[in-house]
A protein has these predicted regions:
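Non-catalytic C-terminal interaction segments of nucleic acid-processing enzymes
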Residues: 1-7, 12-13, 17, 24, ...
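Mg2+/Mn2+-dependent nuclease catalytic core
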Residues: 84-107
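Aromatic- and glycine-enriched beta-alpha-beta binding-site module
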Residues: 78, 102, 115-118
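Conserved alpha-helical elements of sugar-nucleotide-dependent glycosyltransferases
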Residues: 21-29, 98-102
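Conserved catalytic cores of phosphodiester-cleaving nucleases, focusing on short active-site segments
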Residues: 33, 61-87
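Short, flexible/disordered intra-domain loops and linkers
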Residues: 14-15, 50-54, 87-95
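A short acidic/basic microdomain associated with nuclease active sites
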Residues: 31-58, 62-66
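Acidic carboxylate-rich catalytic motifs and surrounding loops in phosphoryl-/glycosyl-chemistry enzymes
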Residues: 44-47, 115-123
Length: 170
């Protein structure tokens, strides 16, 4: 009986710990946006859910941003944040099929580009490596090889730049 209780408690602690790591990485990504030019529309913070239920809002990307120019049009986009401790056998599992489908539906419904920020190694609030890719480039795979992410590698401490002509986040 005690082993079952201990295992359940350990699982719950691990789940909360994983959500805390997710929240730290999301906060790290948000800080890479210059507040002078980017407005945080929505932050769907990583939070544990009760009884295995996920609210509908949590199926959408973690962050919605706007590039804002004084007196000009606003350019919206979203970012899904994923931090992983390391690559395993040269790859990571980044999302379940239903999550990826949900991100695609969000992108199509709202007609705004979705990007995926992937931090590897270090700590969630200070990853060793950072990759930033358009969802359109990876939505066919829930496992990503390190070699596939190389073109999207960026310096982890560099602020983001959004090219509203090409709809690309750098």
């Amino acid at each position: 009986m005690n082993q079952i209780a201990a295992r359940t408690t350990s699982t719950n602690v691990t789940q909360v710990d994983n959500y805390k790591k997710g929240e730290l990485f999301e906060e790290y990504i948000i800080k890479l946006f210059n507040e002078q030019f980017f407005y945080l529309n929505k932050w769907r913070k990583s939070t544990p859910y009760a009884d295995g239920q996920i609210s509908g809002d949590l199926w959408n990307p973690d962050i919605e941003m706007e590039l804002v120019f004084s007196g000009k049009k606003r350019y919206r986009f979203a970012v899904e944040c994923k931090w992983r401790k390391e690559f395993t056998d040269g790859k990571i599992f980044w999302a379940r099929d239903e999550q990826i489908v949900s991100y695609r539906i969000f992108q199509d419904q709202w007609r705004i580009p979705v990007f995926v920020a992937i931090g590897i190694g270090g700590a969630p609030d200070n990853p060793e490596r950072l990759f930033l890719t358009p969802l359109n480039n990876i939505y066919m795979h829930n496992e990503l090889y390190e070699s596939d992410l190389i073109p999207y590698k960026r310096k982890p401490t560099s602020r983001f730049y959004y090219d509203f002509i090409q709809l690309k986040l750098f």
